[in-house]
């Protein structure tokens, strides 16, 4: 991607994808970017042999807690904890260029979706899939997990990427596209979680937006009825005659499930605000219609981290009044959780009260829609946590992504659940998570690897295409400069 990102996009919207792939960077921006790439290559080459590598970055949405790599505002690399080197990625945290005519953007790999959408909404455009939390980065969503309410019609974030400039573990910088020399890396990069390399920049497609989103909430009293409605939207693009540009849902229990269908709207007779005292997830139980600005819709879940702000007291009306609005956001809550994990404050309080220890169950899993009801019933019986987020998805392209083998054409539902549950007497940490992993496998699903996993090595590689990963690792990181996928996602290295 010297001064331009070149290549062809995945199938679907082929003409637009081709236009996106040919976006030219302005000369000054291109020169600054090339200088940043050269500096990163130099610092990477200077790392001691055998030293593990981490990015020193501002944010993280992973829940495999470990000591962070140090932030490096003024230096290209710093020695990290346990011998890990923290490479400074600050030069890759900006939107390099938005091309409204091509409906495309060239974006640094460490750019947050908050910054990206701030840049694109000025032009009446947004990425095809905008994950729910502001500080998720574009590179993180492509190499890890990213999903949202457009995923039934637009798939996953990698599917609207037309080109990536990647720094693999072997130290090269390569341009990967769907049909170029590094096409296998292009398709194998999703779900590699930084173990094959890091995306320095990505060229992505954009779609036009309207100023508002018109929401309609539909209630269901059984999981089966809810899954039938998801299948209806997948087949018809609407639910009970209402267009579905967006669809997700919230399950408060087996007999109280809501699907929220959104449609772009040029007008809004009123606009709700869930950045103040009102809380979005509670609103789906109320009036059946709602209107949000497009920006507020994109970040409707971030203000309360879905419902996970509750343990911090932020949903208490008095505390909410005192809690500054600028601190009602997911990265603040995540920092509080990380602090608690480091100091074991919640564990100590639980023990002091004489209560059983609690296990963190923080997962996103994809289940075929025809088995979605079975999963909800299994989860209610074995884990018993609520609410649960529901997000339908279907791959946009006809080609699978080797390391996360969802089947093209099949409709899945992502179930997200994030919290803690008490351990049964005699059980140890990991009990519920292992139950979830076994249940997901039995139902033909997969789970995202952004949080703790307990798979055996054989189970892991059977689920995540070990042979394909081994080929890519051999080609792009033959000396193992970067951690392996199993080592990183299961062993926490």
Where on the chain are the PLM-derived regions?
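Noncatalytic alpha-helical scaffold of FAD-dependent oxidoreductases
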Residues: 1-493
């Amino acid at each position: 991607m010297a001064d331009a990102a070149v290549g062809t996009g995945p199938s679907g919207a082929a003409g637009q994808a081709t236009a996106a792939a040919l976006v030219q960077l302005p000369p000054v921006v291109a020169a600054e970017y090339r200088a940043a790439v050269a500096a990163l290559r130099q610092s990477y080459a200077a790392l001691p042999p055998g030293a593990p590598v981490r990015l020193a970055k501002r944010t993280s949405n992973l829940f495999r807690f470990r000591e962070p790599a140090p932030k490096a505002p003024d230096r290209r690399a710093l020695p990290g904890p346990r011998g890990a080197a923290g490479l400074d990625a600050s030069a890759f945290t900006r939107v390099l260029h938005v091309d409204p005519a091509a409906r495309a953007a060239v974006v640094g790999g460490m750019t947050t979706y908050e910054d990206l959408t701030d840049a694109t909404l000025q032009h009446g455009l947004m990425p095809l899939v905008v994950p729910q939390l502001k500080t998720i980065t574009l590179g993180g969503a492509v190499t890890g997990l990213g999903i949202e309410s457009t995923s039934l019609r637009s798939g996953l974030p990698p599917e609207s990427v037309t080109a990536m400039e990647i720094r693999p573990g072997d130290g090269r910088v390569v341009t990967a596209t769907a049909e170029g020399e590094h096409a296998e890396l292009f398709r194998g990069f999703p779900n590699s979680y930084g173990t094959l390399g890091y995306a320095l920049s990505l060229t992505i497609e954009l779609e036009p937006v309207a100023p508002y989103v018109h929401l309609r909430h539909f209630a269901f009293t059984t999981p089966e009825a809810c899954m039938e409605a998801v299948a209806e939207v997948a087949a018809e693009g609407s639910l009970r005659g209402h267009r579905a540009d967006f669809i997700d849902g919230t399950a408060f229990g087996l007999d109280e499930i809501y699907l929220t269908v959104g449609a772009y709207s040029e007008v809004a007779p009123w606009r709700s605000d869930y950045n103040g005292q009102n809380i979005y997830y509670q609103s789906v139980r109320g009036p059946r219609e709602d209107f949000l600005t497009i920006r507020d819709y994109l970040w409707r879940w971030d203000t309360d981290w879905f419902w996970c702000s509750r343990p911090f007291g932020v949903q208490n009306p008095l505390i909410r009044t005192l809690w500054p609005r600028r601190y009602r956001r997911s990265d603040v809550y995540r920092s509080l959780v990380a602090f608690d994990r480091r100091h074991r404050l919640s564990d100590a309080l639980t023990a002091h009260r004489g209560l059983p220890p609690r296990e963190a169950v923080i997962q996103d899993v994809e289940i075929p829609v025809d088995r979605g009801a079975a999963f909800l019933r299994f989860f209610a019986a074995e884990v018993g946590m609520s609410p649960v987020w529901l997000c339908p998805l279907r791959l946009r392209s006809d080609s699978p992504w080797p390391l996360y083998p969802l089947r093209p054409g099949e409709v899945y539902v992502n179930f997200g659940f994030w919290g803690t549950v008490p351990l049964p007497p005699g059980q140890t940490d990991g009990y519920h998570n292992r139950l979830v992993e076994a249940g997901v496998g039995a139902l033909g699903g997969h789970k995202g690897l952004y949080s703790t996993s307990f798979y055996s090595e054989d189970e892991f590689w059977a689920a995540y295409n070990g042979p394909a990963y081994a080929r890519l690792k051999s080609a792009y990181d033959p000396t193992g400069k970067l951690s392996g996928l199993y080592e990183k996602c299961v062993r926490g290295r």
